[in-house]
Amino acid sequence: MKAMLNPSKSDCITILSAASELPDGKLLSLDCRSLGLSRNGMDTAARFLIERACFKRYSEGDGHYAVGSLSLQGRLRLDQLANG
């Protein structure tokens, strides 16, 4: 049984906001220091958002994540988290 991911709202907003500025076809390598997040917080939020199809593309390897521009689901989730 998978553990439930419970990321912080602010960690999700930080990752979604960074990805929202990407042009299609580009990937953003997630780095906790440049995003101002803890490693654990960033990993939890990234997995949560990837599982919910918030990005058009993503890659994962050796404990590192890279995400592409936001999918429609990602844009809706960012709006929901930021405004609601």
Residue ranges and their predicted role:
Residues 69-84:
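Short, amphipathic alpha-helical interaction segments positioned at domain boundaries
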Residues 6, 36-52, 65:
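Short amphipathic alpha-helical interaction segments
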Residues 34, 61-62:
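A short beta-turn/loop motif at secondary-structure boundaries
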Residues 62-70:
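Minor-groove-contacting beta-hairpin "wing" of winged helix-turn-helix DNA-binding domains
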Residues 54-60:
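Beta-hairpin "wing" of winged helix-turn-helix
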Residues 4-35:
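Short amphipathic alpha-helical interface segments
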Residues 19, 45-46, 68, 74:
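Small side chains
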Residues 9-13, 43, 72:
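Non-catalytic, well-ordered alpha-helical scaffold segments
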